[in-house]
Amino acid sequence: MAGRSPKVRRRRLGFELRQLRENADLTIEQVAALLEVSDSKISRIENGQVSATPRDVRDMATLYGVKGLRMENLKQLARETKEKPWWSEYSGLKLDFVSYEAEASSILMFAPMILPGLFQTPDYARAIIREIRYDLPSDGIERRVEFRMKRQAHLSESTPPELWAVIDEAILHRMIGDPMIMHHQLKSLVETARLPNVTLQVLPFSGGAHAGLDGPFIIIRFPEPTDRDVIYFEHTGWEHTLDDPKAISLYRLLFDHIRAAALKPDVSLRLLSERAEQLGNQ
């Protein structure tokens, strides 16, 4: 994991407070009335939409009969929701994913069009951003490239998450930038795929129709049992997450079908190496 994420900590604190309230057989309305706050405040804290102060946590947990070390742990969790993570300096960029990625224990990715940002070289990332965000000045492009490279660096600083990615074979042939950019990108990808925490598979053209035809998605899992998995979708201009249990089950099943249809990791690596060599000779 790459560090503490205030967003994940808010979700975790909210989940624990909701469980404590339900175990105390109290409704949101009853808690709000006893603490003389609005129903929406309690609801938003429990849903992880807003941070709770240590005082909020103390007042709520006292109602639920919590004392001692458990109380102190909850208050500390509330303090952690106020911390500024390294990515806070990149306001204005899509930050939902990195907020979850920072505390992930495993990340499952399906990419049918372009390589995920965690695998991109600077030149490959720059070429993509330049095409997708043609409205950006050069410094705006460079800021985004820098952000992606920092994400990669931070993920390798501490215990990294398990990464399992399935990429469509089309990615190997779609010319992003020029042949030399693609050559270096695929060589870098081969090196990354050999890391002990990374599994990479290629979904071949020969497989025909597959379970991922609806588009790219990422499933993020966390080490804490109270943290529900998150499904992440990103498109130009917006990002969206789901943590509904039914949706999570569906996308886990989709990913299982996709990786079952993909080439085995060792075969995928050979294909990547061959394609990198072809591009290097152009």
Where are these regions (language model features)?
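C-terminal regulatory/effector modules of DNA-binding transcriptional regulators
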Residues: 178-282
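Base-recognition residues in the alpha-helical recognition helix of bacterial helix-turn-helix
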Residues: 39-40, 44
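Interdomain hinge/linker segments and adjacent boundary elements that couple functional modules
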Residues: 2-15, 19, 23, 29-33, ...
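Positions that flank functional sites
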Residues: 36, 76, 208
